[in-house]
Curated annotation (Swiss-Prot):
Lineage: Eukaryota, Metazoa, Chordata, Craniata, Vertebrata
One Pfam assignment: IL5
Similarity section: Belongs to the IL-5 family.
GO MF: cytokine activity; growth factor activity; interleukin-5 receptor binding
Name assigned to this protein: Interleukin-5
Length: 134
């Protein structure tokens, strides 16, 4: 019996470790994009004279359109080349993913109970994951 318990715990630990090691394709894309951004930061800054509107709000989820407008401005003012092509391609893929996710915001009509359940989860996310400003 004790051996069975040890084997079960060992299997559970192995499953946990393998679940941590597996990242979603979007997580890998974002990680790669962050690395590319860090690598090419100096090239993107250039002479430092380009002015791009930057949101003041700390809740990045609320400023997605402004962020991607800034990316478009940066892309249009950056000399094309192999060095930054992958970065802008990745950013484009991230935007496409976000746009697909936003299409899921429109939903069917359901009874009020289902909406209230959704609202409760939504408020929980705001309470725990968003930076609250005064």
């Amino acid at each position: 019996m004790r051996m069975l318990l040890h084997l079960s715990l060992l299997a559970l630990g192995a499953a946990y470790v393998s679940a941590i090691a597996v990242q979603s394709p979007m997580n890998r894309l974002v990680a790669e994009t962050l690395a590319l951004l860090s690598t090419h930061r100096t090239l993107l800054i250039g002479d430092g004279n380009l002015m791009i509107p930057t949101p003041e709000h700390n809740n990045h989820q609320l400023c997605i359109e402004e962020v991607f407008q800034g990316i478009d401005t940066l892309k249009n003012r950056t000399v094309p080349g192999d060095a930054v092509e992958k970065l802008f391609r990745n950013l484009s893929l991230i935007k496409e993913h976000i746009d697909r996710q936003k299409k899921k915001c429109g939903g069917e009509r359901w009874r009020v109970k289902k909406f209230l359940d959704y609202l409760q989860v939504f408020l929980g996310v705001i309470n725990t994951e968003w930076t609250m400003e005064s």
